[in-house]
């Protein structure tokens, strides 16, 4: 079993396609197929289910990908240990939920100080990003907190108010039973907070409509399609124009924190150490 075989396996699993992996790796398709087959023969088990639309991981393949992610991350960190210099450089793969308002400020400040670092940013939902950090697919992520997890370190970034957003000036709790609620997909911290609030109030929502993009949710609310709950900072540009109206949540449900997480067993490169320093600096500035 060679390291390259594991890299090919991971690429096929990511694309769910032999063709897609071959294109990314600049291999002929038959070569990728042969390497996967050789790997399956060595392990004496099928790693993929083959079907007309491509491939998907078999139960054994799902076990395999967890080990492969860790092995490849360890190799990457081993290389980084010997390449790491006093000047931060290399690649940092960072995930973020869509509504982190302070992210552009943090990234701009970081890039200005450390231009040799290539930052790769990936948007996602909180639960999805947690999983990717745990599997070493991301070096870290900005997510909704708080979080309790034994293998993840977390750093406070900031805390802000959540607000209920409607197209009407007035709102009653009973409106949840008659008006569609516009939310992100399952795994979003704001959605979880909203669902807990409704559960505490004993309210059965009329209907949940799922979206992937924040601006689509907000514009849909402005058009009267439904109501939503998001951080205040994410909607103020529409509120000041009178396109939507913001209503306070109960005090116990009104605040949500943004935290930065990283795997506690991951090698702490100078690039990551400098990012953590930048996050702390901006937190201190916001509290001043």
Curated annotation (Swiss-Prot):
GO molecular function, one term: transcription cis-regulatory region binding
Entry superkingdom: Bacteria
Record keywords, A-Z: DNA-binding, Transcription, Transcription regulation
GO biological process terms on file: regulation of DNA-templated transcription
DNA-binding residues: 18-37
Domain HTH lysR-type positions: 1-58
Keyword Repeat: no
Family per record: Belongs to the LysR transcriptional regulatory family.
Name by which UniProt lists this protein: HTH-type transcriptional regulator CzcR
Underlying gene: czcR
